[in-house]
Swiss-Prot record:
Binding locations of ATP: G150, G151, A152, G153, V154, G155, K156, T157
Task performed by this protein: Produces ATP from ADP in the presence of a proton gradient across the membrane. The catalytic sites are hosted primarily by the beta subunits.
Subcellular location: Cell inner membrane
GO terms for MF: ATP binding; ATP hydrolysis activity; proton-transporting ATP synthase activity, rotational mechanism
Membrane topology: Peripheral membrane protein
Catalysed reaction equations from the record: ATP + H2O + 4 H(+)(in) = ADP + phosphate + 5 H(+)(out)
Gene: atpD
Upper taxonomic lineage: Bacteria, Pseudomonadati, Pseudomonadota, Gammaproteobacteria, Enterobacterales
Keywords: ATP synthesis, ATP-binding, Cell inner membrane, Cell membrane, CF(1), Hydrogen ion transport, Ion transport, Membrane, Nucleotide-binding, Translocase, Transport
Sequence similarity: Belongs to the ATPase alpha/beta chains family.
Protein name as annotated: ATP synthase subunit beta
GO cellular component labels: plasma membrane; proton-transporting ATP synthase complex
Length: 460
């Protein structure tokens, strides 16, 4: 095991000099004793002359030139398998929940090759989420990739927690949650939410939060993914939740300049597309098992053309766009039904009835959007009878797209609802065909199925 010495420390980037004949490989892990703590470094570049440039996987406070560094001769390895379920780990797979050792039987390196083309499988099976607007407008495929796009504070994390709760309880599969650069409070809330719903023993939690050095945030997504790959290769259907994929990009940006790379557009790293591709190509389903992934994507300044969200778009099967405008109307989940898309929304996959209902809902909402200007200037009375009907139905649809969440019961004060796809289609089809024209629009706000709206109308 070769030993080197630290020659330079710039924030999270540490240069280490090794003997010429024992230079570590790129992505190898190095270990340094920093006071009474072990610090792991990951090799990023070989600079020549026996010097390697590394990223620290923890705080580099207290490091100084001349400290001895050991080459571990393998990439960072993390525990995988059932021992990780119900545990909270950091980027190195070390437990941070004070429940003792993980006690794993196997450790895998976090840098792995993506499955080959022959191993990939293609499934057209739908995954029901119990959230009306998602099941209707942008259905998820089993083994597909979903992105939750939204600016700050429109509900990405709450939507993700609801999805985990619904899928864990209704589908009873294993899930892996990677918290990448998000708030520690959310991680804490999430853990308690999972414990209260008795699904914690089906979830592995990996966190690299906002206060961590960029090395942690850059690699924690790979740590979570590696654990998910192990479950997949055992022949299971596993769910991988990443909150937030934008922080993964941001961590890369933070160290990119320190690694000596020229920045590209908007100051992002020049390797943005490649780094995203390396991660996304591994999140895939093989003939042995599937990984269905849901990734929250922060959209800087609500601009979907920013290079980071724009690069992520290309890899996804379904995009759920959360809109500040809809959130401001008090409609939660604040999913924009006109902006959200899914490759599964095809009559050959979801069936003709589902497809027609979804497209019908979109056309009514689109027409309402066009009429809004006229209403704002001239008022409702200037509209034709036909347009008045469209507006009335559109407003009912808009309210019916809202839904009380289980994980938000403390905020909304109303119990959460899980709505089956069959009930969702029946409800929206009924509104479009005018079966509920006689009900007031308030009856449709924050209810589950259409039957609840009818019941609510009787009490109004």
């Amino acid at each position: 095991m070769a030993t080197g010495k630290i020659v330079q420390v710039i924030g999270a980037v540490v240069d280490v000099e090794f003997p010429q004949d024992a230079v570590p490989r790129v992505y190898d892990a190095l270990e340094v004793q920093n006071g009474n703590e072990h610090l792991v470094l990951e090799v990023q570049q070989q600079l020549g002359g026996g010097i390697v440039r590394t990223i620290a996987m923890g705080s580099s406070d207290g490091l100084r030139r001349g400290l001895d560094v050991k080459d571990l001769e393998h990439p960072i390895e993390v525990p995988v398998g059932k021992a990780t379920l119900g545990r909270i780990m950091n980027v190195l797979g070390e437990p941070v929940d004070m429940k003792g050792e993980i006690g794993e039987e196997e450790r895998w390196a976090i840098h792995r090759a993506a499955p080959s083309y022959e191993e990939l499988s293609n499934s057209q099976e739908l995954l029901e989420t119990g959230i009306k607007v998602i099941d209707l407008m942008c259905p998820f495929a089993k083994g597909g990739k979903v992105g939750l796009f939204g600016g700050a504070g429109v509900g990405k994390t709450v939507n993700m927690m609801e999805l985990i709760r619904n899928i864990a309880i209704e589908h009873s599969g294993y899930s892996v949650f990677a918290g990448v650069g998000e708030r520690t409070r959310e991680g804490n809330d999430f853990y308690h939410e999972m414990t209260d719903s008795n699904v914690i023993d089906k979830v592995s939690l990996v966190y690299g939060q906002m206060n961590e050095p960029p090395g942690n945030r850059l690699r924690v997504a790979l740590t979570g993914l590696t654990m998910a790959e192990k479950f997949r290769d055992e022949g299971r259907d596993v769910l991988l939740f990443v909150d937030n994929i934008y922080r993964y990009t941001l961590a890369g940006t933070e160290v990119s300049a320190l690694l000596g790379r020229m920045p590209s557009a908007v100051g992002y790293q020049p390797t943005l597309a490649e780094e995203m591709g390396v991660l996304q190509e591994r999140i895939t389903s093989t003939k042995t098992g599937s990984i269905t992934s849901v990734q929250a994507v922060y959209v800087p300044a609500d601009d979907l053309t920013d290079p980071s969200p724009a690069t992520t778009f290309a890899h996804l099967d379904a995009t759920v766009v959360l809109s500040r405008q809809i959130a401001s109307l008090g409609i939660y989940p604040a999913v924009d039904p006109l902006d959200s898309t899914s490759r599964q929304l095809d009559p050959l996959v979801v069936g003709q009835e589902h497809y027609d209902t979804a497209r019908g809902v979109q056309s009514i909402l689109q027409r309402y959007q066009e009429l809004k200007d006229i209403i704002a200037i001239l008022g409702m009375d200037e509209l034709s009878e036909e347009d008045k009907l469209v507006v009335a139905r559109a407003r009912k649809i808009q309210r019916f797209l809202s839904q009380p969440f289980f994980v938000a019961e403390v905020f909304t004060g109303s119990p959460g609802k899980y709505v089956s796809l069959k009930d969702t289609i029946r409800g929206f089809k009924g509104i479009m065909e005018g079966e509920y024209d006689h009900l007031p629009e308030q009856a449709f706000y924050m209810v589950g199925s259409i039957d609840e709206a009818v019941e609510k109308a009787k009490k109004l």
